[in-house]
A protein has these predicted regions:
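Short glycine-rich, low-complexity/disordered patches
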Residues: 3, 22, 57-78, 110-113, ...
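Cationic, low-complexity basic patches in intrinsically disordered or flexible, solvent-exposed regions
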Residues: 8-9
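Short, extreme N-terminal segment that most often corresponds to the first beta-strand
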Residues: 15-76
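Short, hydrophobic beta-strand segments
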Residues: 30-36, 82, 98-101, 152-164, ...
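Short, intrinsically disordered low-complexity segments
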Residues: 55-136
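Acidic, proline/glycine-rich low-complexity IDRs
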Residues: 147-222
């Protein structure tokens, strides 16, 4: 092997290691899905309400802020949408949705909770509202999508607030990340105690385990 070829291979290996590191640190979508033993039209919004009641709403933007009704499939246009100013209580939002109950409908609600968010590169953080989406699927919606995605599913958005892998892990960063994770864990624990869900799953779009990613993140500086 010539020196030039060896140098090219070394550069290529370095390039792919860099790519792998970037891919590994990419933010991932985070979800919490629940399945129930009974989830017909008469029960599904009641089950969703039991989850919403445990949610730690943002102090500055409390309540349900948005509701949309999707018929049959995500490809179909919504047949009803409403924004709430100020935010509605879970009971009020569910009451709006309860007028149209069908097994092939999906009911989407949005709310916000407060998570620690970096404001500057100098280490300033603030509690800022972050959107969480509640998705309630009828059993026949999107050809039975609820079987794999959840009858009630929470979309937390990207897992960035619970890892912040883009930041150097100082004591300050670690304390804020841990506070956000504790908010998530406390909410899930309350749901597990109060709901009658038969199956519950916290999962990510990539299939990676959030707890393992967090442990790995913390261990890199120990």
């Amino acid at each position: 092997m010539s020196k030039n070829t060896a140098r090219q291979l070394t550069l290529a290996a370095s390039f792919f290691r860099g790519c792998a590191s970037k891919i590994q640190n990419m933010a991932d979508s985070l979800y919490f899905s629940l399945w129930f033993s009974d989830f017909g039209p008469a029960e599904m919004l009641v089950r969703a309400l039991s989850v919403m009641r445990q949610f730690p709403f943002s102090k500055g933007l409390p309540g349900i802020t948005y509701y949309a009704l999707h018929p049959v499939s995500w490809n179909e246009p919504t047949i009803f949408e409403q924004r709430f100013h100020p935010g509605a209580t879970p009971e009020e939002a569910i009451a709006v949705a309860a007028d149209l109950l069908h097994e092939d409908y999906a009911y989407v609600f949005e709310a916000k909770w407060d998570l620690w968010t970096p404001q500057t590169s100098e280490g300033a953080w603030t509690l800022a509202p972050s959107t969480v989406t509640f998705i309630v699927r009828g059993e026949e919606f999107e050809e039975g999508e609820s079987k794999t995605q959840g009858e009630v599913q929470l979309d937390f958005g990207l897992d960035t607030p619970f890892l912040h892998e883009e930041l150097k892990l100082t004591q300050g960063v670690e304390s804020r990340v841990r506070a956000n994770v504790q908010m998530l864990v406390d909410f899930i624990n309350r749901v597990e105690k109060s709901s009658i869900a038969g199956t519950r799953l916290l999962w990510s779009e990539s299939g990676e385990n959030l707890a393992q990613k967090l442990v790995g993140r913390l261990q890199r500086v120990q």
